[in-house]
Amino acid sequence: MRLSIINITIIGLLLITGCSTKDKNSSKEVKVLNVKETKLNAGIYNVLEGSSQVLWECEWLGGARHDGSVQLVSGSIEISSSSDVNGKFIVDLNSMKCFDLKNEGTNKKLIGHLKSDDFFDVTNYPNAVLELVSGKNISGNEFKFNGNLTIKGRTHPIIFKGTVTENNLSYDADLKLIFDRSKYDVRYRSASLFSDLGDRIIADDVKLTVKAKFKRDSKI
């Protein structure tokens, strides 16, 4: 044991000596940040529809892009623990808006086309549904979620990440999703179905950002 202590002391002195020979001007202070996990409080939380929205973005392979929003019309989450989260969000596709096209006529034409059966066929499928099956805190206020996305009557599993921030016993969520529209029969100029359209092909991946505010259900 005495020999082990001596060896450790010698090694420590060598390390200190080695560090002291470095240029003091080049030394940098290393700070270790303690990231606090977000602990979710059990309960049922309802979406505040007027303060929540879903942002969308899609791209043409030629470089053009469009972005806009759709409105959350209802939704809630039920929290049992930080790893046991389930819920459902319903989106009104008739509320679809486009932000990037400033010309009123062009904007109206695009939205009309997106609502047609070439794309989301909102006459027959007015809503899209996102279900949360489970959620896991992975770092700080960042969570990984497993869920299901339903568009045009077709449901597929989806994995996505997002941040959840507590705000006076309520929560703000910022969720990032990417879905392949071709899986949901949204096939117009699909990159996976057509190869002869050149830069007129529209990318299959559609990006969604769900910005939602939740308030605890006072009746529970």
Describe the predicted segments one by one.
Residues 1-17:
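Sec-dependent bacterial lipoprotein signal peptides
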